[in-house]
Amino acid sequence: MSTEAALLKLQSWFSPSFPVGGYTYSHGLEYGVECGLIHHRESLQTWLEGLLQWGAGHGEGVLFHGAYGAAVRQDWAALHEVTVWAQALRPTAELALESRGQGRAFLVAVQQGWPHPWVQRWGDGLAEHAPYGVVTGLACAAHGVPEAMGLSALLHGMVAGWISAAVRLIPLGQQAGVLVQSALEGEIQTLVRALLSQPASAFQAELGGCAWMAEWCSLKHETQYTRLFRS
Protein backbone atom coordinates (compact mmCIF):
# COMPACT_ATOMS: atom_id res chain seq x y z
CA MET A 1 0.00 0.00 0.00
CA SER A 2 1.26 3.49 -0.83
CA THR A 3 1.93 5.94 1.96
CA GLU A 4 -0.82 8.21 0.65
CA ALA A 5 -3.42 5.41 0.67
CA ALA A 6 -2.44 4.34 4.19
CA LEU A 7 -2.61 7.91 5.42
CA LEU A 8 -6.11 8.37 4.01
CA LYS A 9 -7.35 5.27 5.83
CA LEU A 10 -5.79 6.34 9.11
CA GLN A 11 -7.22 9.85 8.83
CA SER A 12 -10.66 8.30 8.42
CA TRP A 13 -10.36 5.61 11.09
CA PHE A 14 -8.92 7.83 13.82
CA SER A 15 -10.81 10.99 12.98
CA PRO A 16 -13.03 12.42 15.76
CA SER A 17 -15.96 11.92 13.36
CA PHE A 18 -15.38 8.16 12.99
CA PRO A 19 -18.36 6.49 14.69
CA VAL A 20 -16.74 4.79 17.68
CA GLY A 21 -18.32 7.02 20.31
CA GLY A 22 -14.99 8.19 21.69
CA TYR A 23 -16.47 11.50 22.83
CA THR A 24 -18.60 9.64 25.42
CA TYR A 25 -15.60 8.33 27.41
CA SER A 26 -13.20 10.23 29.66
CA HIS A 27 -11.05 7.31 30.91
CA GLY A 28 -11.54 8.41 34.51
CA LEU A 29 -10.57 12.02 33.79
CA GLU A 30 -14.02 13.18 34.88
CA TYR A 31 -13.41 12.05 38.45
CA GLY A 32 -9.80 13.21 38.33
CA VAL A 33 -11.07 16.72 37.62
CA GLU A 34 -13.84 16.39 40.21
CA CYS A 35 -11.40 15.61 43.03
CA GLY A 36 -8.82 18.20 41.96
CA LEU A 37 -6.07 15.91 40.69
CA ILE A 38 -6.31 17.42 37.20
CA HIS A 39 -6.92 21.15 37.23
CA HIS A 40 -4.73 22.92 34.67
CA ARG A 41 -2.64 22.31 31.58
CA GLU A 42 0.45 21.11 33.43
CA SER A 43 -1.39 18.57 35.57
CA LEU A 44 -3.26 17.29 32.51
CA GLN A 45 -0.04 16.84 30.55
CA THR A 46 1.60 14.95 33.43
CA TRP A 47 -1.48 12.73 33.78
CA LEU A 48 -1.55 11.86 30.09
CA GLU A 49 2.19 11.17 30.03
CA GLY A 50 1.50 8.58 32.72
CA LEU A 51 -1.31 7.02 30.70
CA LEU A 52 1.00 6.69 27.71
CA GLN A 53 3.91 5.25 29.65
CA TRP A 54 2.14 3.01 32.17
CA GLY A 55 -1.60 3.03 31.43
CA ALA A 56 -4.01 2.56 28.55
CA GLY A 57 -1.71 4.07 25.94
CA HIS A 58 0.92 1.44 26.62
CA GLY A 59 -1.68 -1.31 27.09
CA GLU A 60 -3.62 -0.72 23.89
CA GLY A 61 -0.33 -0.30 22.05
CA VAL A 62 0.84 -3.73 23.19
CA LEU A 63 -2.46 -5.26 22.06
CA PHE A 64 -2.21 -3.49 18.69
CA HIS A 65 1.30 -4.87 18.18
CA GLY A 66 0.30 -8.40 19.14
CA ALA A 67 -2.82 -8.37 16.97
CA TYR A 68 -1.02 -6.84 13.98
CA GLY A 69 1.66 -9.52 14.07
CA ALA A 70 -0.86 -12.34 14.47
CA ALA A 71 -2.92 -11.05 11.55
CA VAL A 72 0.10 -10.71 9.26
CA ARG A 73 1.00 -14.33 10.08
CA GLN A 74 -2.70 -15.26 9.67
CA ASP A 75 -2.40 -17.00 13.03
CA TRP A 76 -5.99 -16.83 14.23
CA ALA A 77 -5.26 -18.80 17.40
CA ALA A 78 -2.68 -16.17 18.37
CA LEU A 79 -5.17 -13.39 17.59
CA HIS A 80 -7.69 -15.08 19.87
CA GLU A 81 -5.02 -15.28 22.59
CA VAL A 82 -4.36 -11.53 22.34
CA THR A 83 -8.09 -10.91 22.72
CA VAL A 84 -8.36 -13.16 25.78
CA TRP A 85 -5.44 -11.40 27.46
CA ALA A 86 -7.02 -8.04 26.70
CA GLN A 87 -10.26 -9.05 28.38
CA ALA A 88 -8.52 -10.53 31.42
CA LEU A 89 -6.33 -7.54 32.24
CA ARG A 90 -8.89 -4.72 32.31
CA PRO A 91 -8.54 -3.12 35.77
CA THR A 92 -12.10 -1.74 36.03
CA ALA A 93 -15.52 -2.38 34.53
CA GLU A 94 -15.72 1.07 32.94
CA LEU A 95 -12.30 0.82 31.31
CA ALA A 96 -13.32 -2.56 29.91
CA LEU A 97 -16.52 -0.99 28.60
CA GLU A 98 -14.55 1.85 27.01
CA SER A 99 -12.19 -0.40 25.09
CA ARG A 100 -14.82 -2.97 24.17
CA GLY A 101 -17.42 -0.39 23.13
CA GLN A 102 -15.04 1.50 20.89
CA GLY A 103 -13.60 -1.72 19.52
CA ARG A 104 -17.00 -3.10 18.59
CA ALA A 105 -18.03 0.17 16.92
CA PHE A 106 -14.72 0.37 15.05
CA LEU A 107 -15.12 -3.19 13.82
CA VAL A 108 -18.63 -2.56 12.50
CA ALA A 109 -17.63 0.67 10.74
CA VAL A 110 -14.55 -0.86 9.09
CA GLN A 111 -16.49 -3.92 7.96
CA GLN A 112 -19.04 -1.66 6.30
CA GLY A 113 -16.70 0.87 4.73
CA TRP A 114 -13.55 -1.18 4.10
CA PRO A 115 -14.59 -4.86 3.99
CA HIS A 116 -11.82 -7.43 4.15
CA PRO A 117 -11.99 -11.23 4.65
CA TRP A 118 -9.57 -11.17 7.61
CA VAL A 119 -11.68 -8.60 9.44
CA GLN A 120 -14.87 -10.46 8.54
CA ARG A 121 -13.50 -13.79 9.77
CA TRP A 122 -12.41 -12.43 13.12
CA GLY A 123 -15.38 -10.13 13.57
CA ASP A 124 -17.99 -12.84 13.10
CA GLY A 125 -16.66 -14.80 16.07
CA LEU A 126 -15.53 -12.19 18.55
CA ALA A 127 -17.44 -8.98 17.79
CA GLU A 128 -18.88 -8.79 21.31
CA HIS A 129 -15.40 -8.94 22.86
CA ALA A 130 -13.49 -6.62 20.58
CA PRO A 131 -10.79 -4.65 22.44
CA TYR A 132 -9.96 -1.40 20.69
CA GLY A 133 -6.24 -2.07 20.35
CA VAL A 134 -6.87 -5.53 18.92
CA VAL A 135 -9.37 -4.53 16.23
CA THR A 136 -7.33 -1.52 15.12
CA GLY A 137 -4.23 -3.70 14.81
CA LEU A 138 -6.18 -6.27 12.81
CA ALA A 139 -7.64 -3.66 10.46
CA CYS A 140 -4.27 -2.03 9.80
CA ALA A 141 -2.63 -5.38 9.07
CA ALA A 142 -5.49 -6.51 6.83
CA HIS A 143 -5.33 -3.38 4.71
CA GLY A 144 -1.54 -3.20 4.50
CA VAL A 145 -1.11 -0.08 6.63
CA PRO A 146 2.49 0.07 7.92
CA GLU A 147 2.51 -0.88 11.59
CA ALA A 148 4.39 2.16 12.86
CA MET A 149 1.95 4.48 11.09
CA GLY A 150 -1.09 2.63 12.40
CA LEU A 151 0.16 2.46 15.98
CA SER A 152 1.11 6.14 15.94
CA ALA A 153 -2.35 7.05 14.67
CA LEU A 154 -4.05 4.93 17.35
CA LEU A 155 -2.09 6.55 20.18
CA HIS A 156 -2.50 10.04 18.75
CA GLY A 157 -6.25 9.50 18.51
CA MET A 158 -6.48 8.23 22.09
CA VAL A 159 -4.56 11.24 23.39
CA ALA A 160 -6.72 13.61 21.35
CA GLY A 161 -9.85 12.07 22.86
CA TRP A 162 -8.56 12.45 26.40
CA ILE A 163 -7.59 16.05 25.75
CA SER A 164 -10.99 16.81 24.27
CA ALA A 165 -12.66 15.46 27.41
CA ALA A 166 -10.35 17.44 29.69
CA VAL A 167 -10.85 20.69 27.77
CA ARG A 168 -14.57 20.41 28.48
CA LEU A 169 -14.22 19.23 32.07
CA ILE A 170 -11.58 21.45 33.68
CA PRO A 171 -12.33 23.59 31.59
CA LEU A 172 -9.29 24.51 29.52
CA GLY A 173 -8.98 26.79 26.55
CA GLN A 174 -8.56 25.23 23.14
CA GLN A 175 -5.03 26.61 22.89
CA ALA A 176 -4.05 24.82 26.11
CA GLY A 177 -5.34 21.58 24.63
CA VAL A 178 -3.29 22.13 21.49
CA LEU A 179 -0.17 22.70 23.59
CA VAL A 180 -0.69 19.42 25.45
CA GLN A 181 -1.24 17.51 22.19
CA SER A 182 1.94 18.99 20.74
CA ALA A 183 3.95 18.26 23.87
CA LEU A 184 2.97 14.59 23.86
CA GLU A 185 4.11 13.86 20.30
CA GLY A 186 7.55 12.87 21.54
CA GLU A 187 6.05 10.50 24.13
CA ILE A 188 3.98 8.82 21.41
CA GLN A 189 7.01 8.35 19.15
CA THR A 190 9.07 6.95 22.02
CA LEU A 191 6.34 4.45 22.91
CA VAL A 192 5.92 3.33 19.29
CA ARG A 193 9.65 2.70 18.92
CA ALA A 194 9.79 0.79 22.20
CA LEU A 195 6.84 -1.45 21.36
CA LEU A 196 7.97 -2.24 17.83
CA SER A 197 11.45 -3.16 19.04
CA GLN A 198 9.91 -6.28 20.62
CA PRO A 199 8.64 -9.32 18.68
CA ALA A 200 4.86 -9.26 18.28
CA SER A 201 4.63 -12.94 19.22
CA ALA A 202 6.02 -12.13 22.68
CA PHE A 203 3.45 -9.43 23.46
CA GLN A 204 2.63 -10.98 26.86
CA ALA A 205 6.00 -9.86 28.21
CA GLU A 206 4.99 -6.22 27.72
CA LEU A 207 1.48 -6.50 29.18
CA GLY A 208 0.71 -4.79 32.46
CA GLY A 209 0.53 -1.28 33.80
CA CYS A 210 1.11 0.99 36.75
CA ALA A 211 -1.43 3.82 36.34
CA TRP A 212 -2.96 3.30 39.77
CA MET A 213 -4.49 6.73 40.21
CA ALA A 214 -6.13 6.60 36.78
CA GLU A 215 -7.62 3.22 37.69
CA TRP A 216 -8.77 4.55 41.07
CA CYS A 217 -10.46 7.48 39.32
CA SER A 218 -12.17 5.02 37.00
CA LEU A 219 -13.48 3.05 39.99
CA LYS A 220 -14.72 6.20 41.73
CA HIS A 221 -16.36 7.38 38.52
CA GLU A 222 -18.75 4.41 38.67
CA THR A 223 -20.54 6.03 41.62
CA GLN A 224 -19.87 9.70 40.84
CA TYR A 225 -23.07 11.65 41.47
CA THR A 226 -23.04 13.82 38.33
CA ARG A 227 -21.50 12.30 35.21
CA LEU A 228 -21.15 13.55 31.65
CA PHE A 229 -19.12 10.58 30.42
CA ARG A 230 -19.50 6.80 30.45
CA SER A 231 -16.04 6.26 31.93
Swiss-Prot record:
Entry's localization field: Cytoplasm
Record keywords, A-Z: Chaperone, Cytoplasm, Nickel insertion
Superkingdom of this protein's organism: Bacteria
Gene Ontology, cellular component aspect: cytoplasm
UniProt KW Cytoplasm keyword: yes
A molecular function (GO) term: nickel cation binding
Any Pfam family: UreF
Segment forming the signal sequence: none
Subunit annotation: UreD, UreF and UreG form a complex that acts as a GTP-hydrolysis-dependent molecular chaperone, activating the urease apoprotein by helping to assemble the nickel containing metallocenter of UreC. The UreE protein probably delivers the nickel.
Cited function: Required for maturation of urease via the functional incorporation of the urease nickel metallocenter.
Protein family membership: Belongs to the UreF family.
Protein's recorded name: Urease accessory protein UreF
